[in-house]
C-alpha cells in the first residue's frame, strides 16, 4: 500500500477505562472519536511496563511514549538502566559520581543530591536516592552531604510527599531545602517560578522551617499540596555554594534543564529558552559547581553524565528523510520536546526535511483554568501548513487530556477531552477529504480516564490502562500491540520498507 499522506495524531493522556463519574473521557462528548471507532479499523495499545522498556507495572509517560513511537522498537528506559546498575553494583563505582566526591574533597566543600522525591518513576525514583545515600556513606562524605527535595504530587497522590521525605529523613538524609515541582521543575519558561527554587537552594531566600516535615505539614495545613509547595529552607549550612558538587537525580531531562543549566553554566541560563521572556537572574549563582546529571539533559548543561545517552539509528524521522519525504512536527509548548527531541531518540538537531510548528501554551498557574490550552491555535497552524500540499507525513500532539488531567479537576479534564476530540476531528477531516491521506489516532499513555483513586481522592498521575488506536483506512484489520509498532505501521501505509533496526511490527494484519 502507498498512501499520499500518513499522519500520527497523539491524544496525550487519553486512556481506556470503564465509564464512571471519575472518567473524564466517558463523561465527555466524544462523538467524533466514537464515530471513527465505529467506521474505521481500531484496536488497543500497551503503553506501560516492559512493552515500553520500563519495569513491569510501571506506568508510561510522554517521554517514554514518544521515544518508543519514534524508534519503532522497545526503548529500554533510564529507570530500568539505573535499577540494573544498582542491582549489579556498578552504580557505586560510577565514575561521574566518584569524580563529584573527588571535587568536593579537593575543595573541602559539600556534596548535594537534588531531584524529584517520589515513587512515580517518571522523572526520578525513591530507590535511587537510597542508593546515592549508600554511595555517599561508602565515600565517607555523609557529614557534608545535603538533599534538596523537589516534591511531586503530579505523578503521585497530592499529599504523598510527606511520606516520601520521611522515608529519606529516617534513612539518614540531611535535607537542606524543599521546593514543589511547580517551581523547581518548570519547563514552560516561567522563570519567576524557577527563580524562587534556585534562590532557595543557593541563597537561602525563602521561608525557614526547623525540619522538612514541618515545612511540608505547614503547607498542607495552608491548603498547598506537594506540587505547589513554595520553596523553603531547612538548613542554611546545606546551601549550594562555590566549589560544591551536585548530583541531579532526575533521569528525565525536560524538567531538569533550567536548574541544571543555572548551576553548571550560569552564562547560558541568560539565553536558554528566553524567547523574549524574563530570564533567570544568575548574578549571584555559585561558581565552580561540579554537576553530575543522571542522564543527558541538554547541551547547555555542563558536567559529566552518570549514564550516557543511548543512540539509535533508523528512527522514523530519519527513514522519512532518507526517502526524500517532508514531515511536520507539531505541538504546543508543553509537548513540543516530545514530538521533536524525544521522538527523534534524544537528538536535538532538526531533520533537514522537517517543519516544526509550535503553539505557545497559555500562561496560567494550572491548566484546569484554561482546559482548551492552545489546541485551537495549534489546529489552525497545522491545517495552514497542510494546505501547502508539501508534506507526506506529520506527528501531531494534543496535550490537553494529560496536562489538564494532572490537575485532578474532572470537569476541566472533560472539557479538555472534548476540545481535543474536536480539534482531532478538524485535522483528520482535512487529511481525509482534502489530502486523500490517512491518520493514525492514538494516545501515548492513560490519565484522563481515571481522575479519582480508590479512596475517592484526586488521581493526578498517569495510568497503566490500554489506549485506543484507530487508522482511517477501510479494508484493513488492526492487531493489538504496543507503541513500538506505530512507526512500522506508518511506514507500511507510506509504502516504505521497515529498517531492520525497527523490531516493532506493523499493526496492519497481513492477509
UniProtKB/Swiss-Prot annotation:
Instruction: Cite the source lineage.
Output: Bacteria, Bacillati, Mycoplasmatota, Mollicutes, Acholeplasmatales
The GO cellular component terms are: cytosol
Name the record gives this protein: 2,3-bisphosphoglycerate-independent phosphoglycerate mutase
Q: InterPro entries per the record?
A: Alkaline_phosphatase_core_sf, BPG-indep_PGM_N, Metalloenzyme, PGAM_B_sf, Pgm_bpd_ind
* HAMAP family on file: GpmI
Substrates-to-products reaction catalysed: (2R)-2-phosphoglycerate = (2R)-3-phosphoglycerate
One GO-annotated biological process of the protein: glycolytic process
Q: Which UniProt keywords apply?
A: Glycolysis, Isomerase, Manganese, Metal-binding
Task: List ligand-binding residues for Mn(2+) 1.
Answer: 402, 406, 462
Domain of life the protein comes from: Bacteria
- Paired cysteines (S-S): none
Q: Does the keyword ATP-binding apply?
A: no
What does the record note on quaternary structure?
Monomer.
Amino acid at each position: 500500500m502507498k498512501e499520499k499522506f500518513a499522519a500520527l495524531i497523539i491524544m496525550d493522556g487519553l486512556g481506556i477505562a470503564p465509564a464512571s463519574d471519575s472518567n473524564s473521557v466517558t463523561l465527555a462528548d466524544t462523538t467524533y472519536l466514537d464515530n471513527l471507532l465505529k467506521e474505521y479499523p481500531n484496536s488497543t495499545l500497551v503503553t506501560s511496563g516492559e512493552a515500553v522498556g520500563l519495569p513491569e507495572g510501571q506506568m508510561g509517560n510522554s517521554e517514554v511514549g514518544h521515544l518508543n513511537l519514534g524508534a519503532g522498537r522497545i526503548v529500554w528506559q533510564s529507570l530500568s538502566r539505573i535499577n540494573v546498575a544498582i542491582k549489579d553494583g556498578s552504580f557505586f563505582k560510577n565514575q561521574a559520581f566518584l569524580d563529584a566526591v573527588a571535587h568536593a574533597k579537593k575543595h573541602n566543600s559539600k556534596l548535594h543530591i537534588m531531584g524529584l522525591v517520589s515513587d512515580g518513576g517518571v522523572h526520578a525514583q525513591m530507590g535511587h536516592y537510597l542508593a546515592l545515600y549508600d554511595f555517599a556513606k561508602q565515600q565517607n562524605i555523609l557529614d557534608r552531604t545535603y538533599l534538596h527535595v523537589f516534591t511531586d504530587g503530579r505523578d503521585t497522590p497530592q499529599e504523598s510527599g510527606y511520606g516520601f521525605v520521611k522515608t529519606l529523613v529516617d534513612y539518614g538524609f540531611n535535607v537542606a531545602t524543599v521546593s514543589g515541582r511547580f517551581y523547581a521543575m518548570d519547563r514552560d519558561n516561567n522563570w519567576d517560578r524557577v527563580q524562587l527554587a534556585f534562590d532557595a537552594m543557593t541563597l537561602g531566600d525563602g521561608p525557614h522551617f526547623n525540619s522538612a516535615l514541618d515545612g511540608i505539614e505547614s503547607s498542607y495545613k495552608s491548603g498547598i499540596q506537594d506540587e505547589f509547595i513554595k520553596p523553603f529552607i531547612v538548613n542554611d549550612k546545606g546551601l549550594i555554594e562555590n566549589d560544591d558538587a551536585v548530583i541531579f537525580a532526575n533521569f528525565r531531562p525536560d524538567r531538569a534543564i533550567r536548574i541544571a543549566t543555572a548551576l553548571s553554566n550560569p552564562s547560558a541560563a541568560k539565553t536558554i529558552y528566553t524567547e523574549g521572556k524574563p530570564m533567570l537572574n544568575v548574578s549571584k549563582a555559585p561558581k565552580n559547581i561540579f554537576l553530575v546529571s543522571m542522564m543527558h539533559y541538554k547541551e547547555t548543561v555542563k558536567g559529566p553524565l552518570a549514564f550516557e545517552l543511548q543512540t539509535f539509528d533508523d528512527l522514523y524521522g530519519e527513514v522519512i528523510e532518507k526517502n526524500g519525504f517532508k514531515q511536520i512536527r507539531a505541538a504546543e509548548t508543553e509537548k513540543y520536546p516530545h514530538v521533536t527531541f524525544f521522538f527523534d531518540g534524544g537528538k536535538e538537531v532538526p531533520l533537514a526535511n522537517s517543519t516544526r510548528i509550535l503553539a505557545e501554551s497559555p500562561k496560567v498557574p494550572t491548566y484546569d483554568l484554561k482546559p482548551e490550552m492552545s489546541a485551537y491555535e495549534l489546529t489552525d497552524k497545522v491545517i495552514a501548513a497542510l494546505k501547502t500540499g508539501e508534506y507526506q507525513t506529520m506527528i501531531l500532539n494534543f496535550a490537553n487530556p494529560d496536562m489538564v488531567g494532572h490537575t485532578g479537576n474532572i470537569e476541566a479534564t472533560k472539557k479538555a477531552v472534548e476540545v481535543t476530540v474536536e480539534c482531532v476531528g478538524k485535522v483528520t477531516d482535512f487529511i481525509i477529504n482534502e489530502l486523500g491521506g490517512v491518520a493514525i489516532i492514538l494516545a501515548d499513555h492513560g490519565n484522563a480516564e481515571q481522575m479519582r483513586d480508590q479512596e475517592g481522592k484526586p488521581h493526578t498521575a498517569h495510568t497503566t490502562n490500554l489506549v485506543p488506536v484507530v487508522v482511517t483506512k477501510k479494508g484493513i484489520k488492526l492487531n493489538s500491540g504496543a507503541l513500538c509498532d506505530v512507526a512500522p505501521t506508518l511506514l507500511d501505509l507510506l509504502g516504505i520498507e521497515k529498517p531492520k533496526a525497527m523490531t516493532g511490527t506493523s499493526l496492519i494484519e497481513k492477509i
